[in-house]
Amino acid sequence: MFLSTTGDVLDALQQAAFERFVRRGGGFVGVHSAADTEYDWAFYGGLIGAYFSDHPDIQTATIHIELDSHPSTASLPRAWIRRDEWYNFRRNPRGAVSVLATLDERTYSGGTMALDHPIMWAQTYEGGRSWYTAGGHTAESFAEAQFLDHLGRAILWAAGAI
């Protein structure tokens, strides 16, 4: 699990070990600035799905759940209103990943991805499982029961436990 990492966090030996772990069926969960990490490592770029571009100030927005059959989203409301720091991405990951939820840019200011703004996604990647959410910047996120349940289910999914 990469929880709010930024920049280069693994050296070459650690990267090789991490790649072996994933290729042997290991799971990965990325939270928030995990998308602002390891820009020069192609394997990680594919694993994370999309890299961070920028963000507006923290504000309330509506998340629309697209895939409510995934364990991490099954217990969430179809329209989930949360306050957080909302990331824009360098490219849209749709097509490379299974988009679980999108951000409704009509409900906040500062979005740059228009009508299709994925905010959480999952995929199988080179033998392992990868799950990412752009949520989780604020301390309040980790006191929010729905967010914690969502994150816990994502961890279990990535581990292959559900």
Where do the language-model regions lie?
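Extracellular ligand-binding/catalytic regions of CAZymes and related secreted enzymes
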Residues: Y108-D116, T124-I162
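Short glycine-/acidic-enriched loop or helix-start segments at secondary-structure transitions
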Residues: D11-Q14, Y39-W41, G111, F142-A143
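Short alpha-beta junction capping motif
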Residues: M1-E38
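Glycine-rich, charge-decorated loop segments at or immediately adjacent to ligand/cofactor-binding or catalytic sites
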Residues: D36-L47
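Proline-centered loop/turn at the N-terminus of a beta-strand
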Residues: G27-V29, S98, R129
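Catalytic beta-strand/loop cores that center a nucleophilic Ser/Cys/Thr
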Residues: A50, D54-G127
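Histidine-centered active-site/metal-ligand motif
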Residues: H32, H55, H137
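Stable alpha-helical elements in mature extracytoplasmic
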Residues: Q14-A17, D40, D68, F147-L151
